[in-house]
């Protein structure tokens, strides 16, 4: 298994701290609003990593957190007259619903920052004791980055260029020094009683503490195999996580760092600050979650994905092929490449080379359909074909529905009954040799984007996009 390590900037063999086991920490959302397609892409990218590792024989523990203590949450909670717990729980539920719709496997653990305050305080106390942190007059505590000679080694931000000394009035020693603890400022603030005084943790210390508390190993209590997240988290978040871990415990936080690329809208980076966010829940109003998943995984995870609906509909054709084969196999049988599982898994073991994997998938779909055309009654390889289709489900998380359910997405039960009534009416017209009426019914349904197909088993239908 090979993965691209952001820190070394090269593709390297994956060699976990414990043989045949992999522990992964993925930075989750700050829960003050609904999740957008950028969140979806990150979740799907590392869901693919998890699935690939599991099918390669690794025992995987994947942790994805919720940041439920943050300035944005506090500000919105006060504006809406809610507690931060009330507000964050709304968006945790929303995020969970969205990812379920995208068939993202549930993480092994989903810690909330608010559940690990004691661990955060202990880590800050360690940094103060070792003289890597300092407190300013308003009670805030900062990490002294000048004492970490490796600061910037992950993101390649050069402190001498990117930052400068600032006025003594502001009390921070360097502009890049980051807050570990924010003291309670009174009205419209949130604080927790602690040995550090009343206050709350900074964003970066939250994640590091949750990493150690949820993924600690006996032989490496302060290091994990893979730390992952979106490219926007590389600096300052991941850089600062790595820094405070080196300072507190003298080790690198993660053996490997992985980052997924941005999602662009109209060739511009999607972000809430730019006002061009495309929420998952809104996308799900127009497209089934499996169609969105199939589209978002279709571009290599490290590349930028420029979202547009034309490409989404083109990528849907791949899903159509999977379901057409599944539909055929459930009724008729044929042969398939016996090396398919090995070939597609090897593609994914090469830094999640999904483009190559999808090429192998396309080849399998085409060749299998050809063999079904040649041997429509051959039952010998039914189990193998269905096993390979199941493997696609497990590896890529697509093709999981019953074919009829997939091809009838977006049609209500009452509409389905109307269509079935029309099909029955058309059947009677054909029996009475009234082919003009039968064709008229077909055209009427087609005008409503319902296509009919006559098969040996009877007439089936599907919704066109």
UniProtKB/Swiss-Prot annotation:
Coiled coil start-end: none
Placement of sequence motif 'KMSKS' region: 269-273
Oligomeric and partner information: Monomer.
High-level lineage: Bacteria, Pseudomonadati, Campylobacterota, Epsilonproteobacteria, Campylobacterales
Needed co-factor(s): Zn(2+)
SUPFAM superfamilies from the UniProt entry: Anticodon-binding domain of a subclass of class I aminoacyl-tRNA synthetases, Nucleotidylyl transferase
Residues annotated for Zn(2+) binding in this entry: 27, 207, 237, 241
Catalytic class of the enzyme: ligase
Protein name: Cysteine--tRNA ligase
Keyword Nucleotide-binding: yes
UniProt source species: Helicobacter pylori (strain P12)
Compartment(s) of residence: Cytoplasm
Residues bound to ATP: 272
Gene encoding the protein: cysS
């Amino acid at each position: 298994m090979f993965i691209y390590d952001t820190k070394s900037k090269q593709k390297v063999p994956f060699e976990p701290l414990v043989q045949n086991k992999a522990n992964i920490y993925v930075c989750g959302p700050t829960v003050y609003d609904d999740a957008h397609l950028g969140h979806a892409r990150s979740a799907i990218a590392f869901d693919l990593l998890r699935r690939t590792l599991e099918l390669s024989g690794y025992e995987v523990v994947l942790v994805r957190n919720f940041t439920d203590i943050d300035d944005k949450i506090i500000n919105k909670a006060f504006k809406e007259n809610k507690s931060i717990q009330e507000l964050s729980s709304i968006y945790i539920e929303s995020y969970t619903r969205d990812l379920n719709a995208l068939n993202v496997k549930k993480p092994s653990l989903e810690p909330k920052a608010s559940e690990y305050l004691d661990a955060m305080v202990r880590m800050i106390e360690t940094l103060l004791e070792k003289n890597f942190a300092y407190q300013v007059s308003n009670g805030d505590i900062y990490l002294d980055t000048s004492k970490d000679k490796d600061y910037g080694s992950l993101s390649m931000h050069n402190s001498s260029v990117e930052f400068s000394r600032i006025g003594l009035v502001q009390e921070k020693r360097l502009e890049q020094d980051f807050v570990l603890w924010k003291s309670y400022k009174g009205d419209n603030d949130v604080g927790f009683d602690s040995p550090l005084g009343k206050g709350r943790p900074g964003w970066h210390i939250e994640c590091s503490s949750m990493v150690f508390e949820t993924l600690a190993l006996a032989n490496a209590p302060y290091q994990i195999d893979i730390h992952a997240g979106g490219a926007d988290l590389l600096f300052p978040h991941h850089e600062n996580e790595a820094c405070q871990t080196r300072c507190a415990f003298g080790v690198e936080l993660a053996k490997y760092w992985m980052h997924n690329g941005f999602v662009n809208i109209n060739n511009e980076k999607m972000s809430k600050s730019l006002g061009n966010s495309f929420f998952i829940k809104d996308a799900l109003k127009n497209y089934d979650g499996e169609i969105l998943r199939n589209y978002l995984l279709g571009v290599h995870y490290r590349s930028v994905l420029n979202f547009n609906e034309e490409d989404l509909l083109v990528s849907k054709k791949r899903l159509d092929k999977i379901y057409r084969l599944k539909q055929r196999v459930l009724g008729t049988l044929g042969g398939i490449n016996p090396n398919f599982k090995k070939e597609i898994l090897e593609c994914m073991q090469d830094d999640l080379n999904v483009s190559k994997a999808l090429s192998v998938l396309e080849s399998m779909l085409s060749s299998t359909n050809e063999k079904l055309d040649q041997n429509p009654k051959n039952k010998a390889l039914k189990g193998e074909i269905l096993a390979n289709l199941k493997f696609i489900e497990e590896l890529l998380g697509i093709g999981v529905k019953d074919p009829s359910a997939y091809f009838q997405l977006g049609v209500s039960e009452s509409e389905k009954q109307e269509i079935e009534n029309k099909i029955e009416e058309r059947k009677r017209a054909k029996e009475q040799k009234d082919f003009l009426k039968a064709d008229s019914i077909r055209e009427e349904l087609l005008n409503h984007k319902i296509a009919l197909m006559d098969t040996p088993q009877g007439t089936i239908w599907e919704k066109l996009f």
